[in-house]
Each structure stands twice: as structure tokens, then as C-alpha cells.
């Protein structure tokens, strides 16, 4: 009888990346990436107080929030900014960039304002993109009040942090995108699903877009009667 010894690497099992990702998901494991700092304040930029403490938020467009996260690619990173309606959790606009310049954030903001009108309050962290003149001036010109999280307090913007967690576990970590166009297409599909089909416990299982537009329509009907 041949001696029994430890298994050699050659005796292992060949599996592809898709199976590895599926098994990692089942075991609730996530890949480890070096996370870029997307919330670093810029020297000399003005910061603003946090305005949401104790505030009752009960309607669309009362408060929006925005944040940036990183998208791990097969090689390197891209960056994603999203603008969300706080009350309904609907993603109003988003952009992907390969740099952390403020331009892609302002583009998303302009799209959201163009489609939905300005919010009463915009809440962000103190990252340099959100303290930049281009961002703050755009908000001031439409009469939006600016609110910023306390430094290092991610819970001040908790709903968009939850969005990032869902996006990464349900979409980003399941892929290894090669190009920005692949990432953009994948993110776009997921956000469309999230807005229009994904049940949300905060509103009785209704998707964010359904809650947003139904509430807007109801408010307009009430105003018309009044």
C-alpha cells in the first residue's frame, strides 16, 4: 500500500472565479481592498454645521444626501457619487469618475436638480468635493441649505452608507470589471433595480421610486385642493 501523506497542491480542485465568488458570498466573505480616502477635507475650504439633528424628515425633496465610494476594478479603482432623497431613499442621480475631482459630483447634482428641482437641504460629509466652490455655489444659487456630517461620523449620513453596502454586496463584489463602461453598465442596472423593484422596509416594502412619485403626486393633489 502506498504511504498516505499530506495532500499536494496538485491534488486540489480546479475552480473558476465565478464559483469562488459564489462560495465567498454564501460564507459571507468579502474581498479585501485598500480603500481610498474619499472624505478628506481640503485645507482652507469652509465646512458647514450638521442640520439634521432632531429634524423630522417626512417628504421628498426636503433633504437630499450625497456621498462618494470607491469601485474596485480588476486593476485599480473608479469612484462613484450618488445623490439620494433622504425620505424615500430614491437615487436621484449618479456619476462614475477615475479621479476625485469635484466635476463629476457637480454633474450629478446638476442632473438631480434639473430632473427633480432643488432640495431644501443637502447633506454630505466634509470631503473636498463637497466643500468645493463649484458644489457649494451651485447649492446656494438654488436656495438649498448646506449640511455636513461631523468629522469622522459616518452615521450622520447613514442611509447612503447603507446604499453602498447593498450595492457592493449585491453587485460590485460579484464582478471583476475590466473597463469603466462595464462598471457603468453594471451600476446602472443595479440602481434601476434598486429604485424601481427592490422592496424597502422603511416604506412597507415599496420600492423607493414608487414612494417618491406617489408622495409627490399626493402632495400636489393636496395643494391643488387647498
Report each predicted region and the residues it spans:
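Charged DNA-binding/catalytic regions of mobile-element recombinases
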Residues: 1-226
Amino acid at each position: 500500500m502506498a504511504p498516505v501523506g499530506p495532500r499536494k497542491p496538485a491534488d486540489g480542485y480546479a475552480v473558476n472565479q465565478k464559483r469562488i465568488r459564489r462560495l465567498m458570498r454564501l460564507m459571507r466573505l468579502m474581498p479585501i481592498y485598500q480603500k481610498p480616502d474619499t472624505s478628506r477635507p481640503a485645507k482652507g475650504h469652509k465646512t458647514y454645521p450638521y442640520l439634521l439633528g432632531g429634524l423630522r424628515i417626512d417628504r421628498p425633496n426636503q433633504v437630499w444626501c450625497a456621498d462618494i465610494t470607491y469601485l474596485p476594478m480588476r486593476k485599480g479603482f473608479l469612484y462613484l457619487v450618488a445623490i439620494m432623497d433622504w425620505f424615500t431613499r430614491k437615487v436621484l442621480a449618479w456619476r462614475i469618475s477615475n479621479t476625485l475631482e469635484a466635476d463629476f459630483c457637480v454633474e450629478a447634482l446638476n442632473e438631480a436638480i434639473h430632473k427633480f428641482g432643488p432640495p431644501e437641504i443637502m447633506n454630505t460629509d466634509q470631503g473636498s468635493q463637497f466643500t468645493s466652490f463649484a458644489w457649494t455655489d451651485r447649492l446656494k444659487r438654488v436656495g438649498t441649505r448646506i449640511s455636513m456630517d461631523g468629522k469622522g461620523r459616518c452615521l450622520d449620513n447613514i442611509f447612503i452608507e447603507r446604499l453602498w453596502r447593498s450595492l457592493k454586496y449585491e453587485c460590485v463584489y460579484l464582478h471583476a470589471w475590466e473597463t469603466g463602461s462595464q462598471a457603468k453598465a453594471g451600476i446602472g442596472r443595479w440602481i434601476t433595480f434598486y429604485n424601481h423593484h427592490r422592496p424597502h422596509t422603511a416604506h412597507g416594502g415599496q420600492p423607493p421610486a414608487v414612494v417618491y412619485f406617489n408622495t409627490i403626486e399626493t402632495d400636489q393633489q393636496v395643494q391643488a385642493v387647498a
